[in-house]
Curated annotation (Swiss-Prot):
Subcellular location: Cell inner membrane
Designated gene of the protein: ctaB
TM regions (residue ranges): 30-50, 51-71, 93-115, 119-136, 148-168, 175-195, 219-239, 244-264, 275-295
Record membrane topology: Multi-pass membrane protein
GO biological process: heme O biosynthetic process
EC annotation from Swiss-Prot or TrEMBL: 2.5.1.141
Function: Converts heme B (protoheme IX) to heme O by substitution of the vinyl group on carbon 2 of heme B porphyrin ring with a hydroxyethyl farnesyl side group.
Pfam families on file: UbiA (PF01040)
Domain of life where this protein originates: Bacteria
Miscellaneous note of the record: Carbon 2 of the heme B porphyrin ring is defined according to the Fischer nomenclature.
Catalytically driven reaction(s): heme b + (2E,6E)-farnesyl diphosphate + H2O = Fe(II)-heme o + diphosphate
Protein's name in the database: Protoheme IX farnesyltransferase
Gene3D superfamilies reported for this sequence: UbiA prenyltransferase
Length: 295
């Protein structure tokens, strides 16, 4: 009896895992981190329950966008080694089910955010989801190498959403956090595109290395990384502990530029991978430090 029970549970566990991966959890983690940062550093008070609700809505909104993105991109995901094991191309979840999950989570997250938190946060969450789906996924991704640059605005909105959850308004401080993520996104994804250049080419996705070549992509990575550095110093102007922040942000940012320079002068994929991995660690540490420096 016990063996039968365990056997019956396994398919359910696998199904839950498949739907979880449909929501792009790795992206969700960073989205939640940046959203929570906005909540924590915003002036004023917020009830802990409202803060939790806002965070959950941001997470659900991110997952909703991820699910609909996988629904729309299932054809090209099936062509690339990096993405062909995703739930839809792997045959674990149907396209219709993925779309239903995405639409339901979009509605739930935006509605709850509007009712339980405030209208502006709900509207911004809806804009973030809509921009990622309609502007980036459905329009830009398959048409222009600037897909990541423009589309990055969707992923840069969570700290503003977190901020408005507390204050009910957008401020310069929240826009600085937006700008950091906006400038971080291109070099992060261009490093990934260098690693998967041939796969993007096979899937006919006009990533920068495919349309303009590897050398041009390296120049763009270096330029954006250099421009990102002074922008990341701006939070020191409004955080309560600017010294703690700057002594962390400066070496972090310099290392980011160093990694970008390594990518520029190297043709070894190892450096592309290091840049991609470091960029994730970089954003995690930077926003954690922003939160800690606000106390």
């Amino acid at each position: 009896m016990g063996i039968q029970s365990s056997t019956m549970k396994l398919p359910l566990i696998h199904e839950i895992s498949d739907y979880w991966h449909l929501l792009k959890p790795k992206i969700m983690y960073l989205v939640v981190l940046t959203g929570v940062t906005g909540i924590i550093i915003a002036p004023g008070n917020i009830h802990p329950l409202i803060a939790v609700i806002s965070t959950l809505c941001i997470a659900l909104g991110s997952g909703a966008a991820g699910a609909i993105n996988m629904w729309y991109d299932s054809d090209i995901d099936a062509l690339m080694t990096r993405t062909k094991t995703r739930p839809i191309p792997a045959g674990k979840i149907s396209r219709s089910s993925a779309l239903e999950v995405g639409l339901v989570l979009s509605f739930i997250s935006v509605t709850i955010m509007m009712i339980a938190v405030n209208y502006i946060s709900g509207i911004l969450l809806a804009i973030s989801i809509g921009f990622y789906i309609y502007v980036y996924t459905m329009y830009l991704k398959r048409r222009t190498p600037q897909n990541i640059v423009i589309g990055g605005a969707a992923g840069a909105l969570p700290p503003i959403i977190g901020w408005t959850s507390v204050t009910g308004s957008i401020s310069i401080e929240s826009l600085v956090l937006f700008l950091i993520i906006f400038m971080w996104t291109p070099p992060h994804f261009w490093a990934l595109s260098l690693l998967n250049y041939h796969e993007y080419e096979k899937a006919k996705i006009p990533m920068l290395p495919v349309t303009h070549g590897i050398f041009t992509t390296k120049i763009h990575i270096l330029v954006y990384s250099i421009l990102l550095f002074p922008i990341t110093l701006l939070p020191g102007l409004f955080l309560k502990d600017p010294v703690l922040y700057e002594i962390t942000a400066i070496p972090l940012g310099l290392m980011f530029v160093v990694q970008a320079f390594q990518v520029f002068k190297s043709s070894i994929s190892y450096h592309y991978r290091v840049m991609f991995t470091y960029s994730i660690i970089y954003l995690f540490i930077l926003f954690t430090c922003i939160m800690l420096s606000s106390f």
